[in-house]
């Protein structure tokens, strides 16, 4: 029973992740004409999406994104999120620092996959 609940929650989380679109996913279609999109196979379209997501102006994982919080790169199917924290230095001055990292949902999904793999392989 517990295993069934676990996999149903995991399945719903993966469906949610796959169906959620970012603005970049919607804007990708503007780079291609409609005829080009019809002519591309799924593999070619996926490669084009990955090439577009690796553009030079995106911020890689664990790099600072304080000035550009929406420019974090994508990795595989998931977009990094800019997570911020307040840091107090030696002079008791508060500054906000941000870095591109996986969101909480992505961390939970990745952990669920790892646990699922461990359960299946045993």
UniProtKB/Swiss-Prot annotation:
Gene Ontology molecular function: toxin activity
Keyword Transmembrane helix: no
Prosegment location in residue numbers: 21-47
Source domain of life: Eukaryota
InterPro entries noted in UniProt: Spider_toxin_CSTX_knottin (IPR019553), Spider_toxin_CSTX_Knottin_CS (IPR011142)
Chief location bin: secreted
GO cellular component entries: extracellular region; membrane; other organism cell membrane
Role noted for this protein: Potent antibacterial peptide with anti-inflammatory properties. Inhibits both Gram-negative and Gram-positive bacteria by disrupting both the outer membrane and the cytosolic membrane of bacteria. Also downregulates the expression of pro-inflammatory mediators (cyclooxygenase-2 (PTGS2/COX2), nitric oxide-induced synthase (NOS2), IL-1 beta (IL1B), TNF-alpha (TNF)) and upregulates the level of anti-inflammatory cytokine (IL10) by inactivating mitogen-activated protein kinase signaling in a lipopolysaccharide-stimulated murine macrophage cell line.
Protein name according to UniProt: Lycotoxin-Pa4a
Organism of this sequence: Pardosa astrigera
